[in-house]
Amino acid sequence: MLGKEIGKDQRQKRIQDIILRESVSTQAELVKLLAKEGVQVTQATVSRDINELRLVRVPIGKGRHRYALAQYGGDSDIEEQLARLFQSFVQDVDRGENILVIRTADGHASGVALLLDRWKRDDIVGTLAGEDTIMVVARSTHDGESLMEEFNALMLG
């Protein structure tokens, strides 16, 4: 079957549909599943789509993970999800004045950062996530201290 030329929005919608119905652990698997639907795409493009869609990797047991759409049901739900993610994937939190650096397991920074952004806290100016590191900018040094305490509490449960 020849690959279809589809736009970015359609491709990302297909990715979301696949993630909802299949257990996809890797970008390579997602490329293959898209190809089965006639959508030819590179792994680099899938990687960008995953980041733009802010897909999260969730544990499915025995050290395995799968991609999932982030679900939100309000602030308390976000706090519960943050606690689970911090306990499962955050390895360290450090602070310098009003900037905090959160180190996560590989591939989990964007999922944690997304929830921090959705938390809509006045004391958080914004976040920037890489593959395994998140920079959180607090509004003030005092806010940075408070956030450091909260993040450490989230890690401990």
From Swiss-Prot:
GO BP terms in the entry: L-arginine biosynthetic process; protein complex oligomerization; regulation of arginine biosynthetic process; regulation of arginine metabolic process
Keywords: Amino-acid biosynthesis, Arginine biosynthesis, Cytoplasm, DNA-binding, Repressor, Transcription, Transcription regulation
SUPFAM superfamilies reported in the protein's UniProt record: C-terminal domain of arginine repressor, Winged helix' DNA-binding domain
Localization per Swiss-Prot or TrEMBL: Cytoplasm
Pathway the protein acts in: Amino-acid biosynthesis; L-arginine biosynthesis [regulation]
Record's keyword annotation contains Cytoplasm: yes
GO cellular component, as recorded: cytoplasm; transcription regulator complex
Family: Belongs to the ArgR family.
Role, per record: Regulates arginine biosynthesis genes.
Protein name per its UniProtKB record: Arginine repressor
Source organism of the structure: Deinococcus radiodurans (strain ATCC 13939 / DSM 20539 / JCM 16871 / CCUG 27074 / LMG 4051 / NBRC 15346 / NCIMB 9279 / VKM B-1422 / R1)
Lineage: Bacteria, Thermotogati, Deinococcota, Deinococci, Deinococcales
Gene: argR
